[in-house]
């Protein structure tokens, strides 16, 4: 079968126009930014303007609010994400005009084609690990191009055009499109049974990861987390070279003695029995020590000086919406985090509890009805490290409502499984007012979720600055 691919685009960059349907998406915008920096003409549409689209317009992109056939103008290729429906008017018009329509991952693969690429895949930790790899390679003077699924604080962007032949990308497994990629080095952080609406079962998901790992060339490398049973189960089926990392003594790269101290995580790293010394990252949670260990493994295999790795990880400024402090008022610290899967919630709350030793108040917004439905059982025990839990309605992300997969049903289920302080607040906008009377000086408030829960932190801080806390 012949694929719709635009090879001519990369020979005529100054004449070619690439149109993105869903330009404001975090994955789409990163590719668009790299293409703009390479000299391509970029246009795109989305349902509404955002900080992301405004940034791209300042860089030279043309933005259309709303999806219409006339937005295509002189597009040579149309790029879509898995969230774009087949009946989208721009997609329909492109097909009628015989303009190639390709998935986001295929355009990313075209950018990677002539590069030595590192791709980071896994259910959790992709964005942080991708950002760490890019940071370490940059510190080593290798100046990679990077396309990340989140805004890297030091870049204030999710993309960077480098001058070298190296590229670092985040590989999205959600719809199987990461199988378009052919990385030289592949990292797999973990595998959890998610995106079952696409894969159907865990075996099919694992098979996709096996195929991804076997796409590296004969001179390439896979870096696999041995602590994750679903990743370890892949090892007999991996035909290309791999190294493992984790806390197990069977791992090629091992960590020990994880220490959480406020916003810093420290650990000792080993390559087999050889000590590599202590490392620290300015991030909360043992899971970030594992992310850093994967980066150490890549750097060691690429012969990057160990001290460069140590220093750059210590200076790594993190990624937005990954335990990001939004502010402090009346002795209450407000933090925002993207965590929306039970594993992510569990790790983030455990890190917060261990690192700060303070009362943890959580406001959680479930993300997608399918995820809430499929992982309801796992969610019920994910909030044990919170002292007070507020749950709001599901952020649909375009999905149809599923009976029983609602925010109030989740709150009831968590309560039924033993949590003693759970409150359901239907409207996200009512959360700040609901939280305020429950807060005490010294509390850590954590807003969790991949939707618009991120707005609650600033709204709560504004309220705290104008309204005294209730007396005990």
From Swiss-Prot:
Pathway named in the protein's UniProt entry? Cell wall biogenesis; peptidoglycan biosynthesis
Q: Which domain of life is it from?
A: Bacteria
Q: What is its EC number?
A: 6.3.2.8
The record, for Gene3D superfamilies, names: Mur ligase, C-terminal domain, Mur-like, catalytic domain, NAD(P)-binding Rossmann-like Domain
* Intrachain S-S bonds: none
Q: Name one Pfam family in it.
A: Mur_ligase
Q: Which GO terms describe its molecular function?
A: ATP binding; UDP-N-acetylmuramate-L-alanine ligase activity
Q: What is this protein called?
A: UDP-N-acetylmuramate--L-alanine ligase
Keywords carried by this UniProt record: ATP-binding, Cell cycle, Cell division, Cell shape, Cell wall biogenesis/degradation, Cytoplasm, Ligase, Nucleotide-binding, Peptidoglycan synthesis
